[in-house]
Regions:
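Mid-to-C-terminal functional-domain signal that highlights helix-capping/loop sites
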Residues: 1-146
Length: 146
């Protein structure tokens, strides 16, 4: 079985609404409230422990590190979200190397988010992913050097 990855952004509501002001949101279904509660990911993210048998990456950051995976023109690059927060300037911008080009990202610390700047969003796919998952689906990707 092969999974298809889907480019996406995980950003604050304020950031999204500023860029897409006509966005509407579907409400939660009240009859599924108990199901939503049981499916909360809090337990998974509460510790660094991996809760199932799976090969762990032999390199890079801890398995549950939040990463941004960038893909374009046959290049795949991982960027650690913690690292982006560290290097972002006071306006929330960070620059990383993706293949032979420099890519500008918009970063927030609280909550921790990162997205491609407008000039790169059309030509580069990005997705937020945990290191353990990302390394498994894209083992050829390199770790960015900001």
């Amino acid at each position: 079985m092969e999974l298809d990855t889907v480019p996406h952004e995980l950003v604050t509501w304020a950031d999204w609404l500023e860029r897409y002001p006509r966005t509407t949101v579907a409400g939660a279904r009240p009859e599924l409230k108990n199901r939503y509660k049981k499916g909360k990911p809090d337990v998974w993210f509460a510790s660094d422990d991996v809760m199932f048998q799976t090969p762990l990456p032999e390199d890079g950051p801890p398995p549950k590190s939040h990463m941004l995976l960038l893909r374009s023109d046959g290049q795949s690059t991982f960027v650690g979200l913690d690292r982006l927060i560290e290097i972002a300037d006071e306006s929330g911008e960070a620059v990383v190397q993706h293949g032979d080009r420099s890519v500008r990202l918009i970063v927030t610390e609280y909550p921790p988010t990162a997205r491609l700047a407008a000039e790169d969003a059309a030509s580069i796919d990005s997705m937020r992913i945990l290191w353990i998952s990302g390394r498994a689906i894209s083992p050829e990707s390199v770790l960015a050097t900001p």
